[in-house]
Amino acid sequence: MICRTCLRRASGFARPAAAAATRPMVAASSRAAFSTTFSVCTPPAATPAAAAPATSTAEAGLAPVPGAATTEQAKAAISSCPAGTKLNGLNYFKNKADPVALPDEEYPEWLWRCLEVQKKTDDAADADAGDEFSKSKKQRRLAMKRARAQEAKILASGDLEALAPKIPLQKQSVNLPGAVNGGVQDAVLADEKREELRKAMRKERKAKIKESNYLKAM
């Protein structure tokens, strides 16, 4: 028969074991509750399907910019001054600020072709410039260069008669066209020939005046 003292001791040994067995369950439940609340706060992980467009865009080298900005960057800039550049020294109004460069599309189209017209005018002036009897070395060089180019062009065409020395119009001893009983076409032709002779004589007189003034100033 077991005495009361032994029963008390046996019950005292069993209680700490039961408490130790219940403690891990409480800790596990508290951990589960904590992890549940924490998982609600954390954002969901990105799926491969959602990350695929961003990866493909980055690999292609495309930036997520609006379409209008992309088209503006694709256009080639005509002006050397970007929009918003302050143009110093171009203001001719009193008590006004210097102008600011505008975008290229705000300027008229004919503005970008002004230099082309000026270039054509300069080319035409260079073609008429040059005098082999000029006092300027540059003008004589231009005349010789133009004569060599003309001679090479004539030789390439095969017309050797054009290489014969030409007498200036004001030095020629020929009769001007004209008829007393001629028609309108004859009168127009005679007027054109007289105008050509008048221009040639005027050019010669100007050259002589320049030469005489230069000799007087020496």
UniProtKB/Swiss-Prot annotation:
<keyword id="KW-0809">Transit peptide</keyword>
<dbReference type="Pfam" id="PF08561">
    <property type="entry name" value="Ribosomal_L37"/>
</dbReference>
<keyword id="KW-0687">Ribonucleoprotein</keyword>
<keyword id="KW-0689">Ribosomal protein</keyword>
<comment type="subunit">
    <text>Component of the mitochondrial large ribosomal subunit (mt-LSU). Mature N.crassa 74S mitochondrial ribosomes consist of a small (37S) and a large (54S) subunit. The 37S small subunit contains a 16S ribosomal RNA (16S mt-rRNA) and 32 different proteins. The 54S large subunit contains a 23S rRNA (23S mt-rRNA) and 42 different proteins.</text>
</comment>
<protein>
    <recommendedName>
        <fullName>Large ribosomal subunit protein mL54</fullName>
    </recommendedName>
</protein>
<comment type="function">
    <text>Component of the mitochondrial ribosome (mitoribosome), a dedicated translation machinery responsible for the synthesis of mitochondrial genome-encoded proteins, including at least some of the essential transmembrane subunits of the mitochondrial respiratory chain. The mitoribosomes are attached to the mitochondrial inner membrane and translation products are cotranslationally integrated into the membrane.</text>
</comment>
<comment type="similarity">
    <text>Belongs to the mitochondrion-specific ribosomal protein mL54 family.</text>
</comment>
<dbReference type="GO" id="GO:0003735">
    <property type="term" value="F:structural constituent of ribosome"/>
</dbReference>
<keyword id="KW-0496">Mitochondrion</keyword>
<dbReference type="InterPro" id="IPR013870">
    <property type="entry name" value="Ribosomal_mL54"/>
</dbReference>
<dbReference type="GO" id="GO:0005762">
    <property type="term" value="C:mitochondrial large ribosomal subunit"/>
</dbReference>
